[in-house]
Amino acid sequence: MAYFLEQSDSEIFELIFEEYKRQNEHLEMIASENYTFPSVMEAMGSILTNKYAEGYPNKRYYGGCEVVDKIESLAIERAKKLFNCQFANVQAHSGSQANNAVYHALLKPYDKILGMDLSCGGHLTHGAKVSLTGKHYQSFSYGVNLDGYIDYEEALKIAQSVKPEIIVCGFSAYPREIDFKKFREIADEVGALLLGDIAHVAGLVVTGEHAHPFPHCHVVSSTTHKTLRGPRGGLILTNDEEIAAKIDKAIFPGTQGGPLMHVIAAKAVGFKENLKPEFKAYAKLVKSNMQVLAKALKEKNHKLVSGGTSNHLLLMDFLDKPYSGKDADIALGNAGITVNKNTIPGETRNPFVTSGIRIGSAALSARGMGAKEFEIIGNKISDILNDINNVSLQLHVKEELKAMANQFPVYQQPIF
């Protein structure tokens, strides 16, 4: 499957194979990661990587784009069908690039952004001070109640006070559904545009397993991987023709040059997979598996942010524990369970240490694991956390879970 690479660069080839083994033998539970479709990888590794195509279909700056025009047009049409919207830009290189392009299109420097606080589950691009958005614009944030749910009343009061030009509703670590209708009411109250960032839940949205951002959001951004299982990339959607034109200009020439045609082809392939009935079954499994995991952890008296989950992820709360999110991340990693440390509401520790971990079900669900496996995993996570310094236990659990993982290969044949 990788003949030329093995011959020309055995060092990189061996490292890729090492990563292939790691992905097969470990339990990938980072909520933002997933296993893409083999067809998507084939498109990404195609000759399309050779083609420059600055501009848009039928309006390029380079010649020889007649084929890639068809490919990008197909990706756009499939995205519009998948998300039931009128306009789509498929050129954004990532979710962050998509968000930055939206701001570039719709805001002026130092305009006001209202987004979810980073420690409550927001993303860096929602106005965090350390990000581009926090430096080029005036950023404000809303948070969650003591119960871990978004405080919509607080969000309204802040919006009324600061009068933002744009409100961002979306997250990178929030275990509940977003009420897009409530956010639109807040936006209308203060005359703001509403950006729905569905990067994490897009796969649930398109299958009816999560509320849809349209018709409430003026513009929607997403990644094309995570719960969609497509290639790494970004996507911008809208039903407003004027906004769509501004978005196109903001992507090119505003924030990007040549689009990645091999990735755009892979996005088109991914969207076709997302439109299949089998993908609906997958999305249901993602949600049901997370419910099983949450139940198993709660039965072992572990504290979860918001008390549970309504989507593909959960957050464990260690505010009252002697160990940190970093400690748990390392211990579970030693046991073959890959998660990530994460800040949580009421955070008291350093962002590089944290008081929580984020766990997702999308990747293991893609391998075909179900309720039985997720109950086992929940019990093993509990065992590790209850004896967090027991290295021998971690190594023992790692071997047990490796045997289980090998029953659910990531891909049915060797593929890089």
UniProtKB/Swiss-Prot annotation:
(6S)-5,6,7,8-tetrahydrofolate binds at L118, G122, H123, L124, E242. GO terms for molecular function: glycine hydroxymethyltransferase activity; pyridoxal phosphate binding. It is found in: Cytoplasm. Pfam families: SHMT. It is an enzyme of class 2 (transferase). GO terms for cellular component: cytosol. Its cofactor is pyridoxal 5'-phosphate. Its EC number is 2.1.2.1. Homodimer. This is Serine hydroxymethyltransferase. It comes from Helicobacter pylori (strain HPAG1). The lineage of its organism: Bacteria, Pseudomonadati, Campylobacterota, Epsilonproteobacteria, Campylobacterales. The gene is glyA.
